């Protein structure tokens, strides 16, 4: 079951090790569009043999407009090459404990697009190096605003037609959504207050006048006091998020002959 992942980044050196630890074992190819990172982002990505890094060309264009345009077309090169494509931001960990078997079962059922169930994850401090976030940092809250059509069959979908933020879409082609949603999208943005504040400040500095005028990503402009209050509230309300149900194991074939076949 071949899976190609497409993402974008800017100065993500802190989250990249966790991102690669999650996705490298479960996807076959990772294409990262870099928006002129100046930290160790490119160095860390280059160390992974599955990663191909490309420049994100956007000039003065709105950050969100550029990303919307990118993710409408970048995945099309995987037609005829991959069974599934996954579109995810660096802090979005699409998760199922039986990943390959789950995707194979979905494809056998004729499903061509999978909408992941969104969870806003939170931790009191930044996780230690080597942590497997999806299975060790498991406290958060259900957030339907984070639901996302993260996985689809490239040969079946003509256009995804995302809305801004890519949490909703109006796909065209052979569109068959899964009847039940088992894949999770665990959003690891709130990894300690210090990390959250620093990331908010950095991303706020990247918003263009067009972004601000449209009210896009306005949450990056919140003052530190309100961000701190929201973070404390998230910690207090967080609960352990259970893993999606595992797939039932296929029954073992009995070696014992039935009575009507015995001789």
Residue ranges: model-predicted function:
Residues 34-47, 60:
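A conserved acidic beta->alpha catalytic loop
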Residues 46-87:
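Active-site-proximal specificity loops/subdomain of glycosyltransferases
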Residues 89-93:
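Short acidic donor-binding/metal-coordinating loop in glycosyltransferase active sites
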Residues 21-29:
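Short, acidic, metal-binding catalytic loop of nucleotide-sugar glycosyltransferases
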Residues 3, 7-21, 36:
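Active-site beta-to-alpha loop of glycosyltransferases that engages the nucleotide-sugar donor
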Residues 28-36, 56-57:
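Short beta-strand/loop segment that forms part of the nucleotide-sugar
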Residues 64-72, 96-263:
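Catalytic-site signature of metal-activated, phosphate-bearing donor transferases
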């Amino acid at each position: 079951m071949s899976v190609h992942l497409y993402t974008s980044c800017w100065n993500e050196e802190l989250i990249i090790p966790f991102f690669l630890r999650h996705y490298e074992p479960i996807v076959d190819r990772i294409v990262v569009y870099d928006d002129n990172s100046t930290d160790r982002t490119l160095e860390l990505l280059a160390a992974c043999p599955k990663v191909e890094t490309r420049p994100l060309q956007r000039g003065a264009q709105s950050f969100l407009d550029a990303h919307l345009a990118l993710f409408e077309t970048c995945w099309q090169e995987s037609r005829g090459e991959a069974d599934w494509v996954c579109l995810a931001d660096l802090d979005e960990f699409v998760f199922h404990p039986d990943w390959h078997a789950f995707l194979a079962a979905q494809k056998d059922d004729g499903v061509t697009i999978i909408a992941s169930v969104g969870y806003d994850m939170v931790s009191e401090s930044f996780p230690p190096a080597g942590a497997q976030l999806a299975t060790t940092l498991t406290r958060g809250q259900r957030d339907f605003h984070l639901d996302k059509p993260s996985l689809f069959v490239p040969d079946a979908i003509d256009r995804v037609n995302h809305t801004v933020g890519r949490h909703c879409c109006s796909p065209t082609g052979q569109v068959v959504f899964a009847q039940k949603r088992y894949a999770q999208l665990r959003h690891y943005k709130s990894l300690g207050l210090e990390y959250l504040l620093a990331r908010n400040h950095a991303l706020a500095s990247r918003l263009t006048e067009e972004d601000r005028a449209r009210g896009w990503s306005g949450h990056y402009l919140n003052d530190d006091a309100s961000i701190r209050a929201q973070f404390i509230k998230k910690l207090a309300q967080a609960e352990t998020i259970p893993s999606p149900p595992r797939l039932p194991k296929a029954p073992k074939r009995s070696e014992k002959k039935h009575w009507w076949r015995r001789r």
